[in-house]
Curated annotation (Swiss-Prot):
It is found in: Cytoplasm. This is Uracil-DNA glycosylase. Keywords: Cytoplasm, DNA damage, DNA repair, Hydrolase. SMART domains: UDG (SM00986), UreE_C (SM00987). Its main location: cytoplasm. The gene is ung.
Length: 230
């Protein structure tokens, strides 16, 4: 099988790509991309694994499925491409970021700089039909991303897992909480942010944990201007 993830995640996940469930998912996706408008672009499906290698992952921010509007999703949870309006959940993340660690909000939602510092921005489902949230749930992606979470949890170097909302928090069963740090809060969506997301201080808590592991803290301040890599 020719590698289609070009980092050490390939070795971690390759056994999954050889299993029947993934072959079924692959056939489903081929038909979906051929006949419908699917996000993200097929070349960006595994972008989170490309930008944040397994050995470099220090933090995981878990999402559900990609944004389902045109031109938003590019393979990272919560992140959108430059030139697209910042989605409401990310607006609230920026509010908490400013309140927690004093970061100045930016007018884009492109979280590449976090990913390149070791923040794995992982959705549990990696594709979605345009305009239809959760349309690719239950097709097999969850099995693959659950394995990614488990392998990180088992790693000798600990990881900070940030779980926002009920769906993300259900993944705690995959994580060894004795050796890793888990930060839980309500989802940053406008529907739930006031129930405890605001004031949860995930960014400062993450950096305290990383420092205790002997790791470099994350610089959460996003650049004011971003350029797409080609």
């Amino acid at each position: 099988m020719k590698a289609f993830i070009h980092t050490d995640w390939w070795d971690v996940l390759k056994p999954e790509f050889e299993k029947p469930y993934y072959h079924q998912l692959h056939e489903f996706l081929k038909n979906e991309y051929r006949t419908k408008n699917i996000h993200p672009d097929m070349y960006n499906i595994f972008q989170a694994f490309e930008w944040t290698p397994f050995a470099d992952t220090k933090v995981v921010i878990l999402g559900q499925d990609p944004y389902h509007g045109p031109g938003q999703a590019h393979g990272l949870s919560f992140s959108v491409l430059p030139g697209v309006a910042v989605p409401p959940s990310l607006v609230n993340i920026y509010k908490e970021l400013q309140d927690d660690v004093g970061c100045t909000p930016v007018n884009h939602g492109y979280l590449e700089s976090w990913a390149k510092q070791g923040v794995l921005l992982l959705n549990s489902v990696l594709t979605v039909q345009n305009g239809v949230a959760f349309s690719h749930a239950g097709k097999g992606w969850e099995r693959l991303t659950d394995v990614a979470i488990q392998r990180l949890s088992e790693r000798s170097t600990p990881v900070v897992f940030i779980l926002w909302g009920k769906a993300a928090r259900s993944k705690i069963k995959l994580i060894d909480t004795q050796t890793n740090v888990v930060l839980q809060a309500p989802h940053p969506s406008p529907l739930s942010a006031y129930r405890g997301f605001f004031g949860s201080k995930p960014f400062s808590k993450t950096n305290i944990a990383l420092t205790s592991f002997g790791e470099q803290p994350i610089n959460w301040q996003l650049p004011e201007h971003v350029n797409l890599e080609h």
